[in-house]
Amino acid sequence: MLPLKQSEEALKDKRRLRWACRRGMLELDVLFEPFVDQAYDELSEEQKAVFRRLITCDDPDLFAWFMGHQKCEDEELAEMIRFMLSRVKV
């Protein structure tokens, strides 16, 4: 029964994560939601922590970073942004 409980917790966590990825901007929604569905499970625990940190950033900053209008100074976040852009085709 323990593996099932872990699986249920993982699903609950992923549902919460998908909810947190719903942004106020469509341009960000089309990046974050498919990434969670398609690639999040493949990330290492360290990468998942970086992703969770990324989604706490403000929408204007995220938009500027993903659209290439500004450079993200945090190298871990910048690497996650590059990875996400390589995985999600819009």
From Swiss-Prot:
Major localization class: cytoplasm
InterPro entries on file: SDH, SDH_sf, SdhE_FAD_assembly_factor
Single GO cellular component term: cytoplasm
Alphabetized Gene3D superfamilies for the sequence: Flavinator of succinate dehydrogenase
Keywords: Chaperone, Cytoplasm
Record-annotated membrane-spanning stretches: none
Gene Ontology biological-process entries: succinate metabolic process
Record flagged with keyword Repressor: no
Subcellular location(s) per record: Cytoplasm
Domain of life: Bacteria
Keyword Cytoplasm: yes
Biological role stated in the UniProt entry: An FAD assembly protein, which accelerates covalent attachment of the cofactor into other proteins. Plays an essential role in the assembly of succinate dehydrogenase (SDH, respiratory complex II), an enzyme complex that is a component of both the tricarboxylic acid cycle and the electron transport chain, and which couples the oxidation of succinate to fumarate with the reduction of ubiquinone (coenzyme Q) to ubiquinol. Required for flavinylation (covalent attachment of FAD) of the flavoprotein subunit SdhA of SDH and other flavinylated proteins as well.
Family: Belongs to the SdhE FAD assembly factor family.
Protein name: FAD assembly factor SdhE
Protein source organism: Idiomarina loihiensis (strain ATCC BAA-735 / DSM 15497 / L2-TR)
Gene: sdhE
